[in-house]
């Protein structure tokens, strides 16, 4: 959409529950949300005890490999963070196990922490951002995780963790 010529006409069509934007061969259709939009700011953690900076390419490569195994187990991948590394673990009965460590920088927090995510949701954002590092921040294994990038201050992606039996305190 960044390459759209701002001088061209855009045809806008609105129905009861959809809006469409058409220009040349480009067509964008979106659903119109009825009622009051939820307060998304309530989900974004303001303070986080654990913050990590990870090289995006290394994290992406390991996460994609974990996703190959995780597809057989509801896409659940577990992450164990310590002072210098994140261990990425995926298991699937009959398919095998995956474990890989990726170097990171711990920005804040002192304890080793574990959290699990749907790897597809995490990959969606890591593949999309064009940055050298991604920042992950969360309080504990059940709190929302805030993913940010240094280059764009207003970019915030929230991913909710998955509760797993082996990652409960």
Q: What is the meaning of each model-derived region?
A:
Residues 1-33, 48-169:
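DNA polymerase processivity clamps
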């Amino acid at each position: 959409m960044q390459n759209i010529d701002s001088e061209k006409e855009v045809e806008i069509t609105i129905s009861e529950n959809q809006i469409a934007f058409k220009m040349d061969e480009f067509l964008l259709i979106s659903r119109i949300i009825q009622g009051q939009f939820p307060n998304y700011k309530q989900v974004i953690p303001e303070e986080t005890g654990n913050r990590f900076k990870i090289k995006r390419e290394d994290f992406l490569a390991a996460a994609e490999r974990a996703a190959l195994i995780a597809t057989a187990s509801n896409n659940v991948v577990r992450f164990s963070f310590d002072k210098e590394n994140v261990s990425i673990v995926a298991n699937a009965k009959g398919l095998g196990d995956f474990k890989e460590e990726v170097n990171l920088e711990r920005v804040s927090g002192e304890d080793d922490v574990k959290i699990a995510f749907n790897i597809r949701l995490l990959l969606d954002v890591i593949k999309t951002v064009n940055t050298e590092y991604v920042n992950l921040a969360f309080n504990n294994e059940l709190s929302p995780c805030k993913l940010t990038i240094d280059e764009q201050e207003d970019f915030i992606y929230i991913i909710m963790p998955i509760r797993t039996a082996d990652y409960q305190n």
